From Swiss-Prot, chains A, B:
Disordered, as annotated region: 170-218
Catalytic activity: cytidine(56) in tRNA + S-adenosyl-L-methionine = 2'-O-methylcytidine(56) in tRNA + S-adenosyl-L-homocysteine + H(+)
InterPro entries, per database record: Alpha/beta_knot_MTases, tRNA_m1G_MTases_N, tRNA_mtfrase_aTrm56
GO biological process: tRNA nucleoside ribose methylation
Keyword entries, A-Z: Cytoplasm, Methyltransferase, S-adenosyl-L-methionine, Transferase, tRNA processing
Main location: cytoplasm
Family designation: Belongs to the aTrm56 family.
Record protein name field: tRNA (cytidine(56)-2'-O)-methyltransferase
Length: 218, 218
């Protein structure tokens, strides 16, 4: 199965953060490609930065200024996430049988054509909430939760799950039993570092922070 | 089980949209209360507006300027969502046994105290993505997916899930078999209305749009 996420209707002047979250969710929840429309190099750059630091999970990061054409020429199944669609649980088993899936995530008003072009208009509940959440739940259902355990290729840092505080190791120093040699941030440390699972934590890491830096940046 | 979501570190000048998404996810994914810190009346107002239009799902919408005190005086279990925490799948069964759960969602850097105060630091995968997605997945795991089927109390509008386009009915006109009398938006309509499952769709509806308006606003 190959899954691409197409974010349409992105407004560079006001959607940067939400769209970045959409892209990061695509990456972290098992999509193979992320395509942004219209193009916004800053968002793509942020995603590439995350891939460089945390490892490669996406095969392609791209953009298009012809999103309708992109959808029309997609040689696979088209899924459009919308609160007006059919319950995800009623269609996910069928969708999971497909080879190539394009998941459309709208930003501003979604033109009528997308509803028509989509093979599946899928709702994650029928209440208004967030396209970020909708994409995460859709992919989580699609992969049955297995997406959370994918291991990235390369990159510089890995997190060792811990009860309190932060354990971050450099790639290559994880050690056979899960990080002993590379662990410099002691357990229970906490600190002011980027603990929140949000896009913002990425922002502070452009200078190639090691695990030591993670708790010390302000 | 009673679940509250506490959003901490909100920056009114730049987090309004993300925090609104967090609040809407809390509402749509089964939380009973949403507490914002620090206070930002505009975000709370938006949530109240959604509750008024789409029906009541939250029992409490509140804010606090003493978040640490709020956590310290919480007489229940404290969960902190962080990419450095333990895998959600390894702790969710235990958490599900608790009576009262406070879910902390950070925005900017999360102070060390929260890691210490939390009974569970929980990671939705150990990759950076989005606090909006993290909260959605956590609540989805907590409720085993049942949260998507909760019915709100009152409100003005209900969506009837549909294959293409939009079906929206006024509350009270749903009809016994699912909306026949109230359905004015015909199937296959699509249109430029707010189809995306995002907070933005809420914005255009302040004037009390009926289903007719839903597809016509620009």
């Amino acid at each position: 199965m190959k899954v691409y996420v197409l974010r349409i209707g992105h407004r560079p002047d006001r959607d940067k953060r939400i769209t970045t979250h959409v892209g990061l969710v695509a990456r972290a929840f098992g999509a193979h490609g992320f395509v942004l429309s219209p193009c916004d190099e800053k968002v793509l750059e942020k995603l590439r930065d995350v891939e460089e630091r945390w490892g490669r999970l996406l095969e392609e990061i791209a953009c298009t200024n012809s999103p309708l054409k992109y959808v029309k020429t997609w040689d696979g199944t088209v899924v459009h996430l919308t609160m007006y669609g059919l319950p995800v649980d009623s269609v996910i088993d069928e969708i999971r049988q497909k080879d190539k899936i394009l998941v459309i995530v709208g930003a501003e008003k979604v033109p009528r054509e997308y509803y028509e072009l989509a093979h599946y208009n899928v709702a994650i509940g029928n209440q208004p909430h967030s396209e970020v959440a909708a994409l995460a739940i859709f992919l989580d259902r699609l992969y049955g939760g297995a997406e959370l355990y994918r291991q990235p290729v390369g990159g510089k840092l890995r997190i060792i799950p811990t009860e309190k505080g932060k354990k971050v190791v450099k790639v290559g120093e994880e050690g056979p039993s899960g990080g002993a040699p590379g662990v410099r941030a002691e357990r229970g440390r906490g600190g002011r570092g980027e603990g929140v699972q949000g896009a913002d934590e990425v922002r502070g890491h452009k200078r190639g922070a090691t695990d030591r830096d993670l708790g010390d940046e302000t």
